[in-house]
């Protein structure tokens, strides 16, 4: 199983879903060998709700609904619903959860601290996973991470900060958490630039996905972050392409 645990399908927080571009992005991800994408769009994006509804309810991308928040496209690519939550005090957490759980979250940026977010998800019931995103990139450190970090499912190694890999590895070891790879791409170029691989023995059927199965693989330390050759270049190219898309949409 090859999956990118951190994927955006909107080019910016103010952009509307461009369904033609989204379909192209998903097709490119599959052609690049990915089996699954965890859609962690910014929860505070203006059109987050439109994207969530369009992908997982209205099925604008043409897939088979396997479970709430899980689609299998005709190409075989799996999509799982999620959100990137910007925390109070700085930093971001990836929440992997069904759409009904995501819709109950307060969308305002900085509304939750990490402990509050974890408490809300726990109280809401259902299967969820929370991943600390790009904590060593810029000012993305999460202040409460040393205190509640062990309650998370994983630490992310992001494609845009591969030079800090050793820091992420040490943090994951200190918190006794697995390390996952996330592309954090807003365009098709960056998706999968860093991704997560789980062996066939642990995940024998790459045509199915569930948060419970992902969490189980993470708990067993069966996930491995993998950066593709030229990942840094893909990140730079994606940044340029994204700027062009934003200019065209203005």
Where are these regions (language model features)?
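Short, well-ordered beta-to-alpha junction loops that form the rim of enzyme active sites
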Residues: 42, 133-136
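Generic beta-sheet signal
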Residues: 82, 133, 182-183
């Amino acid at each position: 199983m090859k999956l990118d645990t951190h994927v955006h399908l909107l080019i910016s927080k103010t952009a509307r879903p461009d369904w033609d571009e989204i379909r192209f992005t998903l097709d490119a991800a599959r052609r690049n060998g990915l089996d699954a994408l965890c859609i962690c769009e910014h929860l505070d994006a203006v059109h987050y709700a439109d994207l969530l509804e369009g992908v997982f309810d209205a099925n604008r991308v043409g897939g088979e609904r396997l479970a709430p928040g899980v689609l299998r496209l005709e190409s075989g690519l799996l999509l799982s619903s999620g959100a990137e939550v910007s925390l109070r005090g700085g930093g971001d957490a990836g929440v992997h959860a069904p759409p009904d759980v995501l819709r109950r979250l307060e969308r305002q940026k900085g509304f939750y601290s990490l402990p509050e977010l974890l408490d809300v998800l726990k109280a809401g019931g259902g299967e969820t996973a929370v991943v600390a995103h790009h904590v060593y990139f810029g000012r993305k450190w999460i202040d409460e991470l040393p205190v509640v970090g062990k309650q998370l499912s994983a630490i992310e190694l992001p494609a845009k900060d591969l030079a800090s890999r050793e820091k992420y590895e040490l943090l994951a070891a200190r918190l006794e958490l697995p390390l996952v790879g996330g592309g954090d791409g807003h365009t098709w170029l960056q998706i999968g630039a860093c991704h997560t691989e789980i062996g066939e023995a642990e995940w024998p059927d790459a045509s199915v996905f569930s948060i419970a199965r992902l969490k189980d693989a993470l708990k067993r330390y069966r996930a491995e972050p993998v950066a593709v050759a030229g990942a840094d270049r893909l990140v730079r190219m994606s940044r340029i392409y994204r700027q062009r898309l934003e200019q065209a949409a203005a």
